[in-house]
Each structure stands twice: as structure tokens, then as C-alpha cells.
Design a protein with these regions (language model features):
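Pocket-lining segment of extracytoplasmic ligand-binding domains
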Residues: 133-184
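Bilobed "Venus flytrap"/periplasmic-binding protein-like clamshell domains
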Residues: 1-19, 77-149, 155
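Hydrophobic/proline-rich hinge and linker segments of small-molecule sensing/allosteric domains
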Residues: 66-90, 173-184
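Short loop/helix-cap segments at secondary-structure boundaries that form the rim of catalytic
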Residues: 58-61, 115, 159-162
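Short secondary-structure junctions
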Residues: 65-66, 128-129, 166-170
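N-terminal hydrophobic or amphipathic helices and topogenic motifs
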Residues: 1-72, 88-95, 101
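A generic structural signal for short, non-catalytic loop/turn and secondary-structure boundary residues
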Residues: 23, 59, 74, 160, ...
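General small-molecule cofactor/ligand-binding pocket signal
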Residues: 29-33, 129-133, 168
Length: 184
């Protein structure tokens, strides 16, 4: 079994991780991985049971089964598009010379899916290049100015202002406004 290092997962699976639950004679290994590593592992058939992004689960729907419990859906918890420059946006890049660089926390993450959905024109017109990076390295890369934009998840959602970064858009709020459903 493989789960993410997300606090939601480690809390939900605490009983299993710390062997507080009777396994009824079953024995299995548990791997804690970044969400992109989990998605890649599922594409490579490495796991029998694993957490996946909803984006990856949709792509893999012909060969995987989504369990009826354990999913995280919610309001007000989506990824944030951040920049180290105030007032910057991939949409502004449409009228600017050159190409910007946007970091996403993995190709088949929900965060990357939302960026592609809402900023597809900037990607299509080659005004921003998408690169994938470990979620915990995105904000440091923005601060170092090695990228123009970053789609941040987990604790970055709450600490970006303290890091001197600027909010371009709350992608989760936009999803909720445009669809009326919780963010997967």
C-alpha cells in the first residue's frame, strides 16, 4: 500500500502506520511518497492499493478502481497559483515578449490539471512552459526566481505570504465558482 506524506493521509492511516490495528494475519508494506511519485507508481503498476490524484485516477480509470472511502473532496482547500512578482500572471504573459516558466507538483496532479484547465491558452501559445517539481521545492524556486509561477499545495497554501510571494489566483476557488462542486 502506498499513501502520500500529506497530513490528511498520515492522520487517516495512523492506526495502520503505527500498527495499532489488527491486520488479521495480513502483512504488507506501506510506502509514504509524494503524490507525483504515487501517480507514476500507479502508471507503472507498482502498487496494489495506493492514493492517486483524481486527475491520475481519471486517466487510469480503465485499469483501476476508486475505493468508496478515503477520498479527499472539499471546499476552500485548492492549490494556489503564486508568483515572486506582484501583479504577474500567465495571462499577462500573453501580451509580453518571451516565455515564462510555471512549476506544477507533478504531471497528473489535480493542481496541474487545474492550471492546464484555466491557463491552457498561455500554455498553447507558448507564453508559459510547464515544468514539474516536487511540491516542497516550488516555493523556494519562486523565491530564487528560477521560475515565474508556481502551483502550490499543502502547507504552501497557508505560508506563501510569509515567504514574500504573491497570490495570482486561488485555483480551488475558481474551480468551485465555475463548477459548483467540491475540488477533488
Amino acid at each position: 500500500m502506498a499513501i502520500s506524506t500529506c497530513p490528511n493521509d498520515t492522520f487517516a492511516f495512523h492506526g495502520i502506520l503505527d500498527r495499532k490495528v489488527d491486520f488479521l494475519g495480513l502483512d504488507f508494506e506501506i510506502e509514504l511518497l509524494d503524490i507525483q511519485q504515487l501517480n507514476v507508481g500507479l502508471f507503472q503498476d507498482r502498487f496494489e492499493v495506493a492514493k492517486a490524484s483524481f486527475h491520475a485516477a481519471a486517466v487510469l480509470s480503465e485499469r483501476t478502481l476508486v475505493l468508496p472511502s478515503g477520498s479527499a473532496l472539499g471546499f476552500g482547500v485548492g492549490p494556489l497559483l503564486l508568483s515572486a512578482k506582484e501583479g504577474a500572471s500567465p495571462d499577462n504573459a500573453l501580451t509580453s515578449p518571451g516565455c515564462t516558466r510555471t512549476l506544477c507538483p507533478g504531471e497528473f496532479t489535480t493542481a496541474a490539471m487545474l492550471f492546464q484547465l484555466f491557463y491552457g491558452e498561455a500554455i498553447g501559445l507558448k507564453k508559459t512552459r510547464v515544468a514539474h517539481q516536487l511540491f516542497s521545492e516550488i516555493m523556494p524556486s519562486l523565491k530564487e526566481r528560477s521560475a515565474d509561477f508556481g502551483v502550490c499545495i499543502h502547507e504552501g497554501r497557508f505560508t506563501w505570504a510569509e515567504e514574500g510571494l504573491f497570490l495570482v489566483e486561488d485555483l480551488g476557488t475558481r474551480w468551485e465558482r465555475e463548477t459548483g462542486v467540491p475540488l477533488p
